[in-house]
């Protein structure tokens, strides 16, 4: 039995609350169980210098954890004067994942920054950030469309969502919380589109290497999980 008492293929309760920020063009509070992430999408009518006069736009992301999002207070990275390697890795992953389903040419020379701030962490913060980040991005594009600045259907090519899977006590399981993740022999994150395209897979064996058959089981769980997340995204933005 999993520490969370869930079945091996059972995800945590997942919800999206849209429009939670008064100022951001798009926003979403996403909850994967006790992991809560505030995602905001902000529009700037400019692009990075290296993209000027290209006719293309840009989508990027930033990620951070509030000091008391964890069991003990963490020091703010700003007070340390630099971002940690984990933070940089995660925010680059979020940006890559969102750009995978965006037509940058259709966006035009405008930049959307998706900020993902972890309010409460209980495992899977990067997967929640990607999944909720898509909803915030969608709402930002809706805001732009209402002002004839972009077309949602032309810019946003598909859904994108992410889920974690791992091997806990020899059993492949989906959507690990912190206790499960810290004890898992194998941990993997899957990022996929609504059509089933693979954007990124991150997988690591913490102890014993995992087999090809075990990976196939994790992949099967992830595909079903992504389908569920995409359905929830569709209902959230309907």
From Swiss-Prot:
Keywords: Nucleotidyltransferase, RNA-binding, rRNA processing, Transferase, tRNA processing, tRNA-binding. GO terms for molecular function: 3'-5'-RNA exonuclease activity; tRNA binding; tRNA nucleotidyltransferase activity. One of its GO terms (biological process) is rRNA processing. It comes from the Bacteria. Phosphate binds at residues 86, 124-126. Coiled coil: none annotated. Gene3D superfamilies: GHMP Kinase, N-terminal domain. It catalyses: tRNA(n+1) + phosphate = tRNA(n) + a ribonucleoside 5'-diphosphate. It is an enzyme of class 2 (transferase). CDD domains: RNase_PH_bact. Its EC number is 2.7.7.56. InterPro entries: ExoRNase_PH_dom1, ExoRNase_PH_dom2, ExoRNase_PH_dom2_sf, PNPase/RNase_PH_dom_sf, Ribosomal_Su5_D2-typ_SF, RNase_PH, RNase_PH_bac-type, RNase_PH_CS. Belongs to the RNase PH family. Homohexameric ring arranged as a trimer of dimers. Phosphorolytic 3'-5' exoribonuclease that plays an important role in tRNA 3'-end maturation. Removes nucleotide residues following the 3'-CCA terminus of tRNAs; can also add nucleotides to the ends of RNA molecules by using nucleoside diphosphates as substrates, but this may not be physiologically important. Probably plays a role in initiation of 16S rRNA degradation (leading to ribosome degradation) during starvation. This is Ribonuclease PH. The lineage of its organism: Bacteria, Pseudomonadati, Pseudomonadota, Alphaproteobacteria, Hyphomicrobiales.
